Swiss-Prot record:
Keywords: ATP-binding, Cytoplasm, Cytoskeleton, Hydrolase, Nucleotide-binding. Belongs to the actin family. It is an enzyme of class 3 (hydrolase). This is Actin-1. Its EC number is 3.6.4.-. One of its GO terms (cellular component) is cytoplasm. PANTHER family: ACTIN (PTHR11937).
């Protein structure tokens, strides 16, 4: 009996790539989805300079590199760079030979057909994978929460989607996309701090800003009330030190910044907040399934990690929905990685093994096979 080969699961987000082995409960590798190329050839004499760097190494050398994010708003826009990220994932992060393992990739909701074909082609032709599957990110998050019906509000670094799912199938006509996510919030905070006279030039400083965001921000249950409270006392204020010794004091920004998720006008965007977008998505679905969706609103992605977000979502959705509706918000503690976890669960199910698209099927039918096998 030959040893069962573990499938590889790769969740390519706009901000971070999560990769690991099916059956594991967390990704082995999590690194920034960036590719950097030297701005000037031969600056670093004798460094054995590479023509490109990926992930953390690109981040740490960003001073001499031009950085690109090959995934914008969840969709791959630069295939050469994307290939570099996958290469880095297999050979440097996971240290595996891709031709020996089935590969499960994730895709954004409403990913264009040509993109799915291109992914399929690269996996089979460039990396010689024996088998391949591509799954919609939000559907995997729903599986990770132990459900097959519900609506997923998935908010990452580059994009936010609301995806209603019925019996394991995403309902494309009701999926909504909001181009407001983690990176916009980080950039806004940096802008605020620059206006207050702090400087953010180095990567280390940008990382600190992300740290402030992740450790100090929270969502207010009642925004107006919170502003009043913050104005009357300094209890909410927190201080943190930058690498160069400057001390930043953060007060009502702690909840004012993430408030933009519910009031995008704060960032100058004419868009519905995440609560309204979720409501609009549900409203586009058949009457018969709305009750099931309201009762299973699953939060997913790093930008849903703020304390207080689930309670606020509960309050806002309840006030939008019909009075007889029971609204339940599900916010699993590991939701930062729930897309990856769902992929790990799916790819290790015995019932899933005959659903892989094999190299042989690809050779017979070409990239279009992906639409018949993965839906």
């Amino acid at each position: 009996m030959e040893e069962e080969v573990a499938a590889l699961v790769i969740d390519n987000g706009s901000g971070m790539c999560k990769a690991g082995f099916a059956g594991d409960d967390a990704p082995r590798a999590v690194f920034p989805s960036i590719v950097g190329r030297p701005r000037h050839q031969g600056v670093m004499v004798g460094m054995g300079q590479k023509d490109s760097y990926v992930g953390d190494e690109a981040q740490s050398k960003r001073g001499i590199l031009t950085l690109k994010y090959p995934i914008e708003h969840g969709i791959v826009t630069n295939w050469d760079d994307m290939e570099k990220i996958w290469h880095h994932t297999f050979y440097n992060e996971l240290r595996v030979a891709p031709e020996e393992h089935p590969v499960l990739l994730t895709e954004a909701p409403l990913n264009p057909k040509a993109n799915r074909e291109k992914m399929t082609q690269i996996m089979f032709e460039t990396f010689n994978a024996p088998a391949f599957y591509v799954a919609i990110q939000a559907v995997l998050s729903l599986y990770a929460s132990g459900r097959t019906t519900g609506i997923v509000m998935d908010s990452g670094d580059g994009v936010t989607h609301t995806v209603p799912i019925y019996e394991g199938f995403a309902l494309p006509h009701a999926i909504l996309r909001l181009d407001l996510a983690g990176r916009d919030l980080t950039d806004h905070l940096i802008k605020n701090l620059i206006e207050r006279g702090y400087s953010f030039t180095t990567t280390a400083e940008r990382e600190i800003v992300r740290d402030i965001k992740e450790k100090l921000w929270y969502v207010a249950l009642d925004f107006e009330q919170e502003i009043k409270t913050a104005g009357q006392s300094s209890a909410l204020e927190k201080s943190c030190e930058l690498p160069d010794g400057q001390v930043i004091t953060i007060g009502n920004e702690r909840f004012r910044a993430p408030e933009a998720l519910f009031q995008p006008a704060f960032l100058g965007l004419e868009a519905a907040g995440i609560h309204e977008t979720t409501y609009n998505s549900i409203f586009k679905c058949d009457l018969d399934i709305r009750r099931d969706l309201y009762a299973n609103v699953v939060l997913s992605g790093g930008t849903t990690m703020f304390p207080g977000i689930a309670d606020r979502m509960q309050k806002e959705l309840t006030s939008l929905s019909p009075s007889s509706m029971k609204v339940k918000i599900v916010a699993p503690p590991e939701r930062k990685y729930s897309v990856w976890i769902g992929g790990s669960i799916l790819a290790s199910l015995s019932t899933f093994q005959n659903l892989w698209c094999s190299k042989q099927e690809y050779d017979e039918s070409g990239p279009g096979i992906v639409h018949r096998k993965c839906f």
